[in-house]
Curated annotation (Swiss-Prot):
<feature type="binding site">
    <location>
        <position position="55"/>
    </location>
    <ligand>
        <name>substrate</name>
    </ligand>
</feature>
<dbReference type="GO" id="GO:0000287">
    <property type="term" value="F:magnesium ion binding"/>
</dbReference>
<feature type="binding site">
    <location>
        <position position="206"/>
    </location>
    <ligand>
        <name>substrate</name>
    </ligand>
</feature>
<feature type="binding site">
    <location>
        <begin position="212"/>
        <end position="214"/>
    </location>
    <ligand>
        <name>substrate</name>
    </ligand>
</feature>
<dbReference type="GO" id="GO:0008834">
    <property type="term" value="F:ditrans,polycis-undecaprenyl-diphosphate synthase [(2E,6E)-farnesyl-diphosphate specific] activity"/>
</dbReference>
<feature type="binding site">
    <location>
        <position position="38"/>
    </location>
    <ligand>
        <name>Mg(2+)</name>
    </ligand>
</feature>
<feature type="binding site">
    <location>
        <begin position="39"/>
        <end position="42"/>
    </location>
    <ligand>
        <name>substrate</name>
    </ligand>
</feature>
<feature type="binding site">
    <location>
        <begin position="83"/>
        <end position="85"/>
    </location>
    <ligand>
        <name>substrate</name>
    </ligand>
</feature>
<keyword id="KW-0808">Transferase</keyword>
<comment type="function">
    <text>Catalyzes the condensation of isopentenyl diphosphate (IPP) with allylic pyrophosphates generating different type of terpenoids.</text>
</comment>
<dbReference type="GO" id="GO:0016094">
    <property type="term" value="P:polyprenol biosynthetic process"/>
</dbReference>
<feature type="binding site">
    <location>
        <position position="51"/>
    </location>
    <ligand>
        <name>substrate</name>
    </ligand>
</feature>
<dbReference type="GO" id="GO:0005829">
    <property type="term" value="C:cytosol"/>
</dbReference>
<feature type="binding site">
    <location>
        <position position="225"/>
    </location>
    <ligand>
        <name>Mg(2+)</name>
    </ligand>
</feature>
<dbReference type="InterPro" id="IPR018520">
    <property type="entry name" value="UPP_synth-like_CS"/>
</dbReference>
<dbReference type="InterPro" id="IPR001441">
    <property type="entry name" value="UPP_synth-like"/>
</dbReference>
<feature type="active site">
    <location>
        <position position="38"/>
    </location>
</feature>
Amino acid sequence: MMFKNFPFFKGKKDTSFDHLVEEVKKGYIPEHIAIIMDGNGRWAKRRAMPRIAGHHEGMQVVKKITKFASKLNVKVLTLYAFSTENWKRPKKEVDYLMKLPEEFLGTFLPELIEENVQVRVIGQQDRLPTHTRRAMEKAMEETKENTGLILNFALNYGSRDEIVSAVQHMMKDREEGKVRVEDVSEEMLSSYLMTSSLPDPELLIRTSGELRISNFMLWQIAYSEFWFTDVYWPDFTEEHLLNAITDFQHRGRRFGGV
């Protein structure tokens, strides 16, 4: 049975998946979902395939999950695509990862435009290869007027780096007399982050069974709900995302209260 491993779907054997989707949509849908897409390499290794095969398969899942998140009326979907630490990986793998945005957007951009999806990128883009930057810039330019789901790629992104950069810019504004020490607040610091125009993630998902944050949106996930799964990213499905959201809907978010 499709939903046997999904606790909130138990007892609904005669219910279609589409009906379950509509039931979940009656509840509160997180405005911003962030996903640490982990496990591509291990997925490939288990199948005696090269690691890049796992990344290619993971790209197909991005397409599927983006469409489904849009269907659920999620406002922002942030995907951790490449961290500042990932440069330590073998050059062949890094080179392939830098080609993925071109491949992904080359085939999927028309559908993103049709789905009214807006593409954005956070991260230090100056270190990215020119062909990678151009692919992302083209997608952002061609979707900038779209008003549906914001598909936000974290590419060459590290949260500590982001926070340091934000503080540096704030100090520069202080030197220029634009900021006073007494004006500094959480809201002000947030305004200097790469996500300043976005709501903080309400739900953080990590695949592959790892229980860590990996330098991802450390400031922004202060009050996020976490959802971990042992499933590798290439095996992640719409059912998994629906289950994560259903779990989210059953939690009591107190934000430090009682």
